[in-house]
Amino acid sequence: MPRKGSVPKRDVLPDPIHNSKLVTKLINKIMLDGKRGTAQRILYSAFDLVEQRSGRDALEVFEEAINNIMPVLEVKARRVGGSNYQVPVEVRPERRTTLGLRWLVNYARLRGEKTMEDRLANEILDAANNTGGAVKKREDTHKMAEANKAFAHYRW
C-alpha cells in the first residue's frame, strides 16, 4: 500500500469505433504481451461476426451479454476461530464488470472453434442468450453464495 495517500484511478479512454469504455476494457482483457492492434482486430472481427449471426447491432448484443454475465454476489473466505468460512458478499459495480469481462474472455479462450474471433463471437452470442461457459460461471458463483447464506452474518 502507498504511504503517501491513495493512488488515483486511471481512466480508460473510449475506443475509436464504438466510443465505448466497456469495449476498451474488453480489448485490454483480450490483449496479450501488449499487442493492442491484434486485440482490436480480434474484437472488431468478432463484432462483425456477431452482427452477421444475430442481425442486431454488435454493441447492443455485447452489452446484453455482459449484463447476463456480471455477478451480483460472490463468496469471500473469512477466518473465524480457527476455521475458514465462505462468506457471501455483494460485488461492487466496478468489480462486477471486471469479472464479467474476465470470464467472457477466459471462457472464449477455452472454446473449441478455430480462431479467437469465432470463439469470442460465439461466447458473446451464447452469453446474450443466457447460455455458455461465462453464464454458467456466474450461476455457480451465485449458487455458492446461496449455499453459504448461513454465514452472511460474518460479513465485514
Swiss-Prot record:
MF term (GO), any: structural constituent of ribosome
Keyword Kinase found: no
InterPro entries: Ribosomal_uS7 (IPR000235), Ribosomal_uS7_bac/org-type (IPR005717), Ribosomal_uS7_CS (IPR020606), Ribosomal_uS7_dom (IPR023798), Ribosomal_uS7_dom_sf (IPR036823)
Family: Belongs to the universal ribosomal protein uS7 family.
Gene: rpsG
Protein name: Small ribosomal subunit protein uS7
Keyword list, A-Z: Ribonucleoprotein, Ribosomal protein, RNA-binding, rRNA-binding, tRNA-binding
Lineage: Bacteria, Bacillati, Bacillota, Bacilli, Bacillales
Cysteine disulfide links: none
Pfam families: Ribosomal_S7
Biological role: One of the primary rRNA binding proteins, it binds directly to 16S rRNA where it nucleates assembly of the head domain of the 30S subunit. Is located at the subunit interface close to the decoding center, probably blocks exit of the E-site tRNA.
Organism: Staphylococcus aureus (strain NCTC 8325 / PS 47)
Entry-linked Gene3D superfamilies: Ribosomal protein S7 domain
Known partners and oligomeric status: Part of the 30S ribosomal subunit. Contacts proteins S9 and S11.
A GO cellular component entry from the record: cytosolic small ribosomal subunit
GO biological process assignments: ribosomal small subunit assembly; translation
